[in-house]
Structures are given as structure tokens and as C-alpha cells.
């Protein structure tokens, strides 16, 4: 099983500490988000220098606030330090963030993704970008030696987003998406689109909250509180509705070790290629159990 760990440290030193801990435990990858704290690409550049083996990823960096050329420069700089271990996860974020907090327009998100990738992907592959879109333009190359191409995952959940991702990036990174939805929607949609475009089979990286515990009811109550907001964001709400569940706590993998193990196995059986655990409670027991699966 390809299992990684996600955390959201508030200092660069803690990011290094977490990455070392997870790497020493045998986990294959370490993932951080870009929300309202550290600049994740900067933090992971330090992590890449200090922790030499574990693969690194962002889950995810919002696209709208950064021109694709600037994001490409950051990602390839990180990749130069990481020596090929870095995966760039990007996402559109949400209307309430992009419009309400940044004052930018969130209209036509599928167009935005297509135009963004049209500039970003050549630059990440060491090529020049030469593109004019309706809202984004890019005519430049980057001079960053000793930086291998950067695999790019998109937080694509809807059908149109999955189709664009399959044709232009290396895969999708999901959140709040259970095994039923991965098996019936995410995997078949992105795999079909990639095959039709003559692209390699895409990566499907599934992230979910995880807690190994003897008190499932209490752990689910904690999950319901900690992850409440995701049930109100339209893109995640659509996936929860597809799954046939009420809220985020219902897709969390919670229970004793055998129950959580079975839940992870179901994720892979549904078509995911990688699983990223988000331990949120009873972390020591959860990490110990997850390490036992490696």
C-alpha cells in the first residue's frame, strides 16, 4: 500500500520534525496544505533539504492568487532541492475564499483550470510557455537547472474538472470523497479521459481523516466538529451527497485497527492509487497502526 501522512504545522521547524517522524516510521510521503498559515512551498523546500528520503507534496496550493509562472518557479526551485521527490498539488479553492477573501472573480472555474495548466505544465516540464487565454497569458521560460519535471495533481472532483485534469496533469487529489464515490465516479471518469487522450493511467490520491480508537462515537463527534466546514463547501458537499452520507464525519476512517485497515483497503479497491491519512485524534495509536500496514 502507498500510504502518506498529512499534517498542518504552524512553524517550519515543526514541518521538519513531522517529516522526519513520518519518514523514520516508513511512510512514503509527507503532505502539507496551503491555507492561511505557512507558505507551504517555502516550508517544504526546507524539509526537502533536512529530510532526504521521504517524498513531499502539497495538498493543495490554490491557483487563483498565484500566476502559473510564479507557481512553476516556486515548484521547480523546491524540486531542485528535493531531487525529484516533490509532487505539486493544486486546487481552485472555493468561491467564498477567492471572492470573499481575495476579492477575485471565481467565474468559469473549468476555463480557469484549463488556462492555468496550459501555462503551468510546460514550465514544470522545463519547456517554455506560449499561451494566450481569456484571463491568463504566459510567454516565458524558466532558467532553473538541475530541476526535474514536477508531477502535478489537481483537486479535481467534478466531471469536467476530472476530464481536464486527465488530459493535462498527472492525476487528482481528493478530499472528503469516500470509496463508493471514488469507485463509481472519480476513478472511472479520470481513467477513461486519460485513456481517450492517450495519457498514462493517472494518479488518484485519496485523503481522509483517520482515527484508531475504541470509542468510535466520540471520535466521530470530534471529526464532525473539526471538519464541519467541509460539509458546507459545494465541491465537497457534492461528493458527500454522492457517497450518501450526512457529513464529513461519516467518511472518516474511524474504529479499531481492523476496522480502519479494512477502510483503507476499500479505498484502494475502489481505484485509488495512493492514500494520505489525516490523523486528527488519538494520533500515536493511529500512526502506529498505519505504520504496521507498510
Residue locations for each model-derived region?
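Active-site-adjacent structural elements that line small-molecule/cofactor binding pockets in enzymes
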Residues: 1-294
Amino acid at each position: 500500500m502507498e500510504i502518506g501522512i498529512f499534517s498542518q504545522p504552524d512553524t517550519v521547524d515543526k514541518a521538519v520534525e513531522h517529516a522526519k517522524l513520518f519518514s523514520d516510521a516508513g511512510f512514503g510521503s509527507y503532505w502539507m496544505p496551503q491555507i492561511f498559515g505557512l507558505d507551504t512551498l517555502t516550508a517544504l523546500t526546507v524539509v526537502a533539504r533536512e529530510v532526504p528520503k521521504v517524498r513531499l507534496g502539497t495538498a493543495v496550493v490554490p491557483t487563483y492568487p498565484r500566476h502559473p509562472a510564479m507557481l512553476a518557479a516556486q515548484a521547480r526551485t523546491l524540486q531542485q532541492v528535493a531531487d525529484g521527490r516533490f509532487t505539486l498539488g493544486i486546487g481552485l479553492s472555493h468561491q467564498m475564499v477567492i471572492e470573499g477573501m481575495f476579492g477575485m472573480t471565481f467565474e468559469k472555474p473549468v476555463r480557469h483550470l484549463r488556462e492555468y495548466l496550459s501555462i503551468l505544465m510546460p514550465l514544470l516540464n522545463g519547456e517554455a510557455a506560449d499561451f494566450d487565454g481569456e484571463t491568463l497569458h504566459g510567454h516565458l521560460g524558466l532558467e532553473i537547472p538541475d530541476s526535474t519535471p514536477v508531477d502535478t495533481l489537481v483537486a479535481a472532483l467534478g466531471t469536467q474538472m476530472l476530464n481536464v485534469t486527465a488530459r493535462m496533469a498527472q492525476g487528482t487529489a481528493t478530499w472528503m470523497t469516500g470509496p463508493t464515490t471514488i469507485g463509481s465516479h472519480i476513478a472511472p471518469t479520470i481513467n477513461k479521459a486519460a485513456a481517450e487522450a492517450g495519457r498514462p493511467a493517472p494518479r488518484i490520491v485519496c485523503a481522509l481523516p483517520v482515527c484508531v480508537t475504541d470509542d468510535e462515537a466520540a471520535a466521530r463527534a470530534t471529526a464532525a466538529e473539526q471538519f464541519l466546514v467541509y460539509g458546507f463547501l459545494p465541491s465537497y458537499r457534492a461528493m458527500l451527497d454522492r457517497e450518501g452520507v450526512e457529513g464529513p464525519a461519516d467518511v472518516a476512517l474511524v474504529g479499531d485497527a481492523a476496522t480502519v485497515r479494512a477502510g483503507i483497503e476499500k479505498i484502494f479497491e475502489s481505484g485509488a492509487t495512493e492514500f494520505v491519512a489525516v490523523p486528527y485524534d488519538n494520533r500515536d495509536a493511529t500512526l502506529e497502526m498505519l505504520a504496521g500496514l507498510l
